[in-house]
UniProtKB/Swiss-Prot annotation:
It comes from Porphyromonas gingivalis (strain ATCC BAA-308 / W83). One of its GO terms (biological process) is translation. One of its GO terms (cellular component) is cytosolic small ribosomal subunit. Belongs to the bacterial ribosomal protein bS18 family. Part of the 30S ribosomal subunit. Forms a tight heterodimer with protein bS6. This is Small ribosomal subunit protein bS18. Pfam families: Ribosomal_S18. Binds as a heterodimer with protein bS6 to the central domain of the 16S rRNA, where it helps stabilize the platform of the 30S subunit. Keywords: Ribonucleoprotein, Ribosomal protein, RNA-binding, rRNA-binding. GO terms for molecular function: small ribosomal subunit rRNA binding; structural constituent of ribosome. Gene3D superfamilies: Ribosomal protein S18. The gene is rpsR.
Length: 90
C-alpha cells in the first residue's frame, strides 16, 4: 500500500494559493471614451517588446475597449506612428 502512495503528497489543510489582485479596465475607471490613435506613447502601454498587442487577460481591458485599442494601434501602424514589428521597443 505504501508503494502506491509513494508519488502522491497529501496535505492535512488545503494550501493557500495567493490570488493576483483583480484586474480592471483602466478606460472604465478613468472615464476615457475615445482612444486616440495619434498618441503613440499611450498606445505603447498595450504593446509588448516586439510590438504585438497585449491580450485582455494581461492588460485587464474590457472587450469593448480592447477592440478600440486594437483598432487604434492598427491605425497608428498604418500612419507609421507605431512600428509593425520591432526588437526591444520598450
Amino acid at each position: 500500500m505504501a508503494a502506491n502512495n509513494q508519488g502522491e503528497i497529501r496535505y492535512l489543510t488545503p494550501l493557500s494559493v495567493d490570488t493576483k489582485k483583480k484586474k480592471y479596465c483602466r478606460f472604465k475607471k478613468s472615464g476615457i471614451r475615445y482612444i486616440d490613435y495619434k498618441d503613440p506613447e499611450f498606445l505603447k502601454k498595450f504593446l509588448n517588446e516586439q510590438g504585438k498587442i497585449l491580450p485582455r487577460r494581461i492588460t485587464g481591458t474590457s472587450l469593448k475597449f480592447q477592440r478600440r485599442v486594437a483598432q487604434a494601434v492598427k491605425r497608428a501602424r498604418h500612419l507609421a506612428l507605431l512600428p509593425y514589428v520591432t526588437d526591444m521597443m520598450k
